[in-house]
Amino acid sequence: MTSIEPTHTGKKVIVGMSGGVDSSVSAYLLMQQGYQVEGLFMKNWEEDDNDEYCAAAEDLKDAQAVCDKLGIKLHTVNFAAEYWDNVFEYFLAEYKAGRTPNPDIMCNKEIKFKAFLDFADDILDADYIAMGHYVRRRDNADGTTQMLRGVDNNKDQSYFLYTLSHEQVARSLFPVGELEKHEVREIAKKMGLITHDKKDSTGICFIGERKFTEFLGNYLPAQPGNIETAEGEVIGKHQGLMYHTLGQRKGLGIGGMKNSNDDPWYVVDKDLKRNVLVVGQGGHHPRLMSNGMLVNQLHWVDRKGPAEGSQIVVKTRYRQQDIPCTLTYLDDNTLKVVFDEPVAAVTPGQSAVFYDGEVCLGGGIIDQLIRG
C-alpha cells in the first residue's frame, strides 16, 4: 500500500465513520500512518427512525464499537436540515421534471465534503478529513492535487465524487482507495473490528433498502398513464413516469405480449407532455441509442477542465465501461460530447464524468441527447 505522506505526526484527521467496514479500516490505517484520528458520525435523515429499513441507530452503534476498539473519540452531528435543503429537495425537483437524478453525488458535494468539512474545521480543528471512498489523491510537484480512480476497479467511486473542488480534494484523505475490497475486509478481520463482515450498504443514501416506488410516492403524486410501443400501440399502463428510467427492463408489467418476438422490453423514452412511457424490444433499440449528449452544470476538479477537442473517456453511469469521446465547448457551462460509437440508455439528469487515464477530471449533468 502507498503511504499518503512521508510523515503525519500531530496532523489531526476527522474520519467520517459510517458504521461500515471501509470507514473503520480508514481510521485504522490513518492511525498506523501517525495521524491523530477522531471519528465523526453523521445523521442525515430524520424520518422513519422506527422504520425496519432505517439502520442509523445500528450504524452508530457499530461506529462506536469500532472507535472504542481503536481507542479514538467518536463525535456525532446532525445534518438533516442541510440534507433536506440541499439534497432531497433537488432530488424531488429533478424527478418532478422527468429526469433521473443521482442524489448520492449531491450528498457528497453538499454534505460529506462541505457540511462535514466545515464542521471538522470549525468545531473539531481538523487538518484533514477522511472518508472510506474507493478513490485516490495525488499530490503533484507543482502544488496541485488530483483525484484518481480507486485501485479496485469494481469499487472505484470517483464517479460519485467528481463535484469536489481542488481544495476539497487537497483536504481529504482516502486510505482504502489504495486497496482492493477483499484486502480491506482482511485488515478489519485481523484487527478484530466488528464491521469486518458487515455487508455493503445499497440503495440511495436516504432511502436505504426501502422500495423506491413506495418512498417516492410519499412525496410526489403519481400520475398513471399509458405504455406505448415506439410505433404508438398502447400495450399497458404505468403508475407514474417518475418511477421509470431509460434502459429500464424490469418492473414494466408487459411480459408475454402477443405479436412480439422474445426480446425483452426496455424503456426507450418518456413523453412528458402526453404522460406516456415509450418501450421497445431489445437493449439496442434505435430509440435507446445516442451518438452523443449535451452536458451542462460543468465542474472541473482542477478548475480549468480538458482542452477543446480533447479525446478522453466518459462514464454516463456508475460502473459503466469507459466510453471514448470527443469534447466541444458550446459555452463556459455547456459541453457537446460525441461518442466514438453509439451508446445505449444515456439518461438526462444523470452525471457524465470524464477521465484522462486514471485521473478524474470532473463532469456535469446530462441535459440532452444527440441522436441520428
Curated annotation (Swiss-Prot):
Q: Keywords for this entry?
A: ATP-binding, Cytoplasm, Disulfide bond, Nucleotide-binding, RNA-binding, Transferase, tRNA processing, tRNA-binding
Annotated region Interaction with target base in tRNA: the residues are: 102-104
Please classify the protein's predominant subcellular localization into one broad category: cytoplasm
Location of this chain's protein in the cell? Cytoplasm
Per the record, which residues fall in region Interaction with tRNA?
A: 155-157, 317-318
| SUPFAM superfamilies, per the entry | Adenine nucleotide alpha hydrolases-like
GO CC entries: cytoplasm
Show the catalytic activity.
S-sulfanyl-L-cysteinyl-[protein] + uridine(34) in tRNA + AH2 + ATP = 2-thiouridine(34) in tRNA + L-cysteinyl-[protein] + A + AMP + diphosphate + H(+)
Annotated residues for binding of ATP: 16-23, 42, 132
Q: Which Gene3D superfamilies match?
A: Adenine nucleotide alpha hydrolases-like domains (2.30.30.280), HUPs (3.40.50.620), Translation factors (2.40.30.10)
Question: Active site annotated at which positions?
Answer: 107 (nucleophile), 205 (cysteine persulfide intermediate)
Decide whether keyword Transferase is in the record: yes
> Which one of the record's GO molecular function terms can you name?
ATP binding
Site (Interaction with tRNA) location in chain: 133, 350
SS bond partners: 107-205
UniProt-listed Enzyme Commission number(s): 2.8.1.13
Q: A biological process (GO) annotation for this entry?
A: tRNA wobble position uridine thiolation
What role does it play? Answer: Catalyzes the 2-thiolation of uridine at the wobble position (U34) of tRNA, leading to the formation of s(2)U34.
Q: Which family does it belong to?
A: Belongs to the MnmA/TRMU family.
Tell me the protein's name.
tRNA-specific 2-thiouridylase MnmA
Q: Look up and give the organism this protein is from.
A: Shewanella sp. (strain MR-4)
